[in-house]
From Swiss-Prot:
<comment type="function">
    <text>Catalyzes the deacetylation of 1D-myo-inositol 2-acetamido-2-deoxy-alpha-D-glucopyranoside (GlcNAc-Ins) in the mycothiol biosynthesis pathway.</text>
</comment>
<feature type="binding site">
    <location>
        <position position="22"/>
    </location>
    <ligand>
        <name>Zn(2+)</name>
    </ligand>
</feature>
<keyword id="KW-0479">Metal-binding</keyword>
<comment type="similarity">
    <text>Belongs to the MshB deacetylase family.</text>
</comment>
<dbReference type="InterPro" id="IPR024078">
    <property type="entry name" value="LmbE-like_dom_sf"/>
</dbReference>
<dbReference type="InterPro" id="IPR017810">
    <property type="entry name" value="Mycothiol_biosynthesis_MshB"/>
</dbReference>
<protein>
    <recommendedName>
        <fullName>1D-myo-inositol 2-acetamido-2-deoxy-alpha-D-glucopyranoside deacetylase</fullName>
        <ecNumber>3.5.1.103</ecNumber>
    </recommendedName>
</protein>
<dbReference type="Pfam" id="PF02585">
    <property type="entry name" value="PIG-L"/>
</dbReference>
<feature type="binding site">
    <location>
        <position position="158"/>
    </location>
    <ligand>
        <name>Zn(2+)</name>
    </ligand>
</feature>
<dbReference type="InterPro" id="IPR003737">
    <property type="entry name" value="GlcNAc_PI_deacetylase-related"/>
</dbReference>
<keyword id="KW-0378">Hydrolase</keyword>
<keyword id="KW-0862">Zinc</keyword>
<dbReference type="GO" id="GO:0008270">
    <property type="term" value="F:zinc ion binding"/>
</dbReference>
<dbReference type="GO" id="GO:0010125">
    <property type="term" value="P:mycothiol biosynthetic process"/>
</dbReference>
<feature type="binding site">
    <location>
        <position position="19"/>
    </location>
    <ligand>
        <name>Zn(2+)</name>
    </ligand>
</feature>
<dbReference type="GO" id="GO:0035595">
    <property type="term" value="F:N-acetylglucosaminylinositol deacetylase activity"/>
</dbReference>
Length: 335
């Protein structure tokens, strides 16, 4: 996959994420970089992450098992994170704040909540697609970014975000609407970069090292493009992640109102570590991986004009990890 001088970088990029913090965890470098170079960058969040666990003792009563007020609290965290990433118009939510609820993990009772984003109601599914269609028609992004068919790590809300995104775009394309984007990208974590960063690292007190299967990783050979963050982008991602203090513990020495305990650990190659509530150590990498999930008018016999690759901070892979049919649909894709 190569860059083409005849096409410009996209002017409008929309990220579709399941919960507050996903925009920073999975795509923080790309959000920061696209904002930095002047692209109209928007983040659409589908739920408030009400079923999340909470780091630290102070705000434990916000969880769904207690007062169930965590979702509203996380709106504030998302607002701060977006500011760090250069997205200044504030949070946007599919259908409005709290229209759809965090479904929790698969096979849990929470997925049967009447507002669960990944619930099995056909009426809810249709409404979600229509709500995303309204956003696409209004904002007309050239590039959409979300997750792959497995949602990255199997969370039902991530899988639903993928399915709703692809279905909305399919309907726009089938109707011949100009609002159809040019391409959809799936955010993934490069396995080689992850393992290289974690080699020889000292695990912070109370945290643990990732075991096989703990972190969803994709081998570089299956990745189409890499976002190389500048020091500014990496710092923005780290600050955005730290803003989600109920969900993420960043080992940069910072103490917060949410979590007064500090950790200060970097990898031998200089990356800060972070952990979710499971306390599995992970590096904040200066690179993000992206798979090309769909491209408009794909032709498998020619090099395609791929908008995202015209950003200077995006490095294409040596080959194309996904093969696309003439209808632009990834072979093997069901969503």
């Amino acid at each position: 996959m190569t860059k083409h001088a005849t096409h410009a970088a996209p002017q409008r990029v929309l990220f579709v994420h399941a919960h507050p913090d996903d925009e920073s965890l999975f795509t923080g470098l790309l959000v920061s970089a696209s904002s930095r170079v002047g692209a109209e960058t928007s983040v659409l969040t589908c739920t408030l992450g009400e079923e999340g666990e909470v780091i630290g003792e102070k705000y434990q009563n916000l969880t769904s098992e207690h007062s169930d007020l965590l979702g509203g609290f996380r709106i504030g965290e998302l607002q701060q994170a977006l500011e760090h990433l250069g997205v200044h118009q504030g949070p946007q939510f599919l259908g409005g704040p709290s229209r759809w609820r965090d479904s929790g993990m698969a096979d849990t009772p929470t997925i049967r909540h009447p507002r669960a984003f990944a619930g099995d109601s056909e009426d809810n599914w249709e409404l979600q697609v229509e709500q995303l269609l309204a956003v696409l028609r209004r904002e007309r992004p050239e590039v959409l970014v979300t997750y792959g068919p497995d949602g990255g790590y199997g969370h039902p809300d991530h899988i639903r975000a993928h399915r709703v995104t692809h279905e909305a775009v399919r309907r726009l394309v089938d109707a011949g609407e100009e609002a159809a984007p040019h391409e959809i990208w799936w955010a993934v974590t490069p396995a080689g970069a992850f393992h290289a960063a974690m080699t020889g690292v000292e695990i912070p007190e109370g945290w643990r090292e990732a075991e096989d299967g703990d972190v969803a990783l994709v081998a570089e050979e299956f990745i189409d493009a890499f976002v190389q963050g500048t020091p500014e982008d990496v710092a923005a991602k780290r600050k955005a992640m730290a803003a989600h203090a109920t969900q993420l513990w960043v080992a940069d020495g910072t103490r917060t109102d949410v979590n007064p305990e500090a950790r200060d650990t970097t990898t031998p190659t200089g990356e800060y570590l972070f952990a979710l509530s499971n306390l599995i150590s992970q590096p904040i990498l200066p690179v993000e991986g992206y798979q090309l999930g769909w491209v408009k008018n794909a032709d498998p016999n020619t090099n395609r004009q791929i908008s995202l690759l015209h950003f200077d901070f995006v490095v294409p892979s040596n080959g194309t990890a996904q093969e696309h049919g003439n209808d632009g649909k990834v072979r093997g894709e069901n969503g």
